[in-house]
């Protein structure tokens, strides 16, 4: 009797995870490493990745930290070259680096708007562009752009963020159409409510947290390991016929039946 197919096995694969010094980036990197991938992990300061590098190495995988400022084109080009040189190839990109400004729309400044759009949308495009240039000659690649549940509807208080994540969803579809002929799939993973540095102030408000739980159909916010299966699937050979899609991992909140405002009560 033959052995079962080792689904979602990333052994021998090299994954680049941007913004991996903390938060969701570490969740994604950890899941990929546990599935066998070696990692290139980025942050604006390489030293910020030191502890996570040690963690990945403790799992028996290799990890290389690379500095990356997604708002700087020269930094993106340099990072892509260093990422490829680290292991000789790039199989997977998890395009995760992002930021948010939490203010009423009437109070958002020009610079704050630009910060969010340049990081979340322009940065996502040019990181994907430069990594795709490394993937195209090999005719293989898995690109996972990290979006948000805000790509399907808006929330008060984070208008630029919603605009940027909606843009990532559409960008994903366009890149999937353009690069599919080169064996590259491009998908968007859109988490719902997960505790991160960006929304810590909300999660520290117990009244708001109970309000949120009541409006998520599964009655709880996301936990780190709730994202593992989704990111590993989209990074693996098993997703070879899935491209241009947005996978919402949100406990059902995007059904629209109940909605939680980002405003504290």
Regions found by a protein language model. Give the residues of each.
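Conserved glycine-rich cofactor-binding loop
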Residues: 14, 21-22, 45
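Alpha-helical segment proximal to the catalytic Tyr-Lys
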Residues: 133, 177-181, 240
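Short C-terminal tail/terminal secondary-structure segment
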Residues: 2-7, 153, 232, 243-265
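Active-site loop immediately N-terminal to the catalytic Tyr-X3-Lys motif
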Residues: 106, 153-159, 181-182, 219, ...
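Residue(s) in the substrate-gating loop at a strand-loop-helix junction
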Residues: 148
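Substrate-binding pocket helix/loop in short-chain dehydrogenase/reductase
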Residues: 104-105, 109-117, 143, 212
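Active-site helix of classical SDR
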Residues: 128, 164
